């Protein structure tokens, strides 16, 4: 599927993103049931990076979402660095297996590299 665009999430998207995450995880094999609330908490936290919270959109409808947040990493040699965590990554059921999730990941990784991040988990 190529008829969608990826863009940064806006404040106007937040209610729709909340519902998208909730609905997408209803059919997930592994879920807690509160992934949408987890995303809200991440967005309110100090490790949130607005540029790395993106949506996939087609015909004015949000069909996918990805969020990456910072996390400190302590290496075995004692050195520390900042990496990124991907969570959540959501795609509406009817748009799965069409490349939406892959496109969100690719764009997220591209932007993360541009911003100087060297690791994403």
Predicted feature residues:
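Active-site rim helix/loop that mediates acceptor-substrate recognition in acyltransferases
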Residues: 14, 18-19, 25, 29-67, ...
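Conserved GNAT acetyl-CoA-binding A-motif
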Residues: 105, 110-121
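Conserved acetyl-CoA-binding loop-helix of GNAT-fold acetyltransferases
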Residues: 86, 91, 97-110
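A conserved beta-turn-beta hairpin within the catalytic core of GNAT-like acetyltransferases
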Residues: 72-86, 96
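Short coil/turn connectors at secondary-structure junctions
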Residues: 80-82, 100, 117-118
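Conserved beta-strand segments that form the floor/walls of ligand-binding pockets within enzyme
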Residues: 55, 67, 85, 90, ...
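Conserved N-terminal entry element of GNAT/NAT acetyltransferase domains
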Residues: 1-12
């Amino acid at each position: 599927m190529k008829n969608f665009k990826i863009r940064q999430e806006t404040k106007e998207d937040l209610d729709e993103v909340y519902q998208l995450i909730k609905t997408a995880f209803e059919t997930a094999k592994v879920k807690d049931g509160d992934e949408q609330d987890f995303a809200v908490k991440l967005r309110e936290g100090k490790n949130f990076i607005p540029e790395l919270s993106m949506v996939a959109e087609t015909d004015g409808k949000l069909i996918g979402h990805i969020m990456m947040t910072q996390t400190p990493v302590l290496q075995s040699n004692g050195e520390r660095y900042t990496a990124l965590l991907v969570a959540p990554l959501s795609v509406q059921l009817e748009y799965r297996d069409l490349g939406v999730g892959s496109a969100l990941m690719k764009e997220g990784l591209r932007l993360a590299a541009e911003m100087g991040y060297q690791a994403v988990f």
